[in-house]
């Protein structure tokens, strides 16, 4: 019983048909990006048609590496589920493959606690970590690389 993971009480993403492969890959601890089949360029966020060309899309394996473009320290969460939590860092990450993605910065420790604000810098290299918040949902978060 002591090893039992506490129930996840924070909001979960709304899963849509066009991003189903993304969430399924995360459960396997793989990071995918959608790409434009006409240009081969990856983009973020998943959607049915590619931005710019409105062409068909497919999925590509991605490195899960990037750098912090900008960040904000949030002292109050977006819902009551966050009451009493320490500040968390919401960041825009320039992914190695090109797209920019919004995420949470965390420590690479059990439970993925929030990164301390003083440990974050613009341009800081980061890598993905996979937070298995429920049996169905794994959240992509990022932690300092190296």
Regions found by a protein language model. Give the residues of each.
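OB-fold (S1/OB) nucleic-acid-binding surfaces
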Residues: 83-101
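A broadly conserved sequence feature marking short terminus-proximal activation segments
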Residues: 1-32
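A short, acidic/glycine-rich surface segment
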Residues: 52-54, 75-80
């Amino acid at each position: 019983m002591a090893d039992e993971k506490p129930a996840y009480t924070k909001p979960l993403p709304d899963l849509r048909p066009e991003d189903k492969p993304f969430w399924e890959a995360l459960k396997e601890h793989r990071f995918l990006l959608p790409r434009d089949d006409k240009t081969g360029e990856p983009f973020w966020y998943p959607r049915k048609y590619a931005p710019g060309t409105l062409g068909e899309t497919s999925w590509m394996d991605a490195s899960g590496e990037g750098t912090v473009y900008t960040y904000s320290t949030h002292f109050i969460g977006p819902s009551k589920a966050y009451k009493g939590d320490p500040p968390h860092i919401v960041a825009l990450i320039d992914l190695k493959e090109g797209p920019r993605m919004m995420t949470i910065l965390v420590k690479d420790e059990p439970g993925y606690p929030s990164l301390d604000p003083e440990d974050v810098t613009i341009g800081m290299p980061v890598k993905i970590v996979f937070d298995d918040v429920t049996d169905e949902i794994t959240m992509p978060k990022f932690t300092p690389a190296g």
